[in-house]
Amino acid sequence: LRMLPAVYLLSFLITCFHELGHVLLCRHYCGYVGRCGVMLFFFMPAFYTNTTVAAFAERKQRLEIIMAGVSMQLAAAGLLSVLTVAAVMAGSEAGLLLLMLNIINFLYIFMNLNPLFKYDGYWLLSVAWDISCLYEKSVSEVLRAVNAKKEERQICRRLFVYGVCLIGFYIVMWTAVIIGI
């Protein structure tokens, strides 16, 4: 329990590295980076980097800019793994702290790559499919498919499937929040 403040602070440091990855590649490919900073997201501090300037980069470069944050986290995970093993072999209590930090880091990576959250995974999918406003268009596609007459239904399957997954995901998430899971 006494390690939690250290884990909390160090997880912010890893998040800074994540955002630094976006900044470095955006600056490399575009020469400019938008605003960076800290904001409150669900009453929790969250770092952000405005990479809208990357819209003018080539598609492959945009994908690399989006993946740069997770790449930095994966590099941190490798370093944390080596340090964890070294600390455990030395019999240090720091091994537990490093293990907890690495687990949190992997949870952040998973959450970041989940395309149903509007984080890096969402933007990867949006750029890969070359569809701007993916959330809105996918939900609109589901509503259009549901409301259209049978003979008028011509749907974009990708948008429809993503929209159904998105709606289902948020129904489950909000239900879990409401009932307190």
Regions found by a protein language model. Give the residues of each.
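Membrane-embedded catalytic scaffold of the fatty acid hydroxylase/desaturase
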Residues: 2-154
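Hard-cation-handling environments
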Residues: 149-181
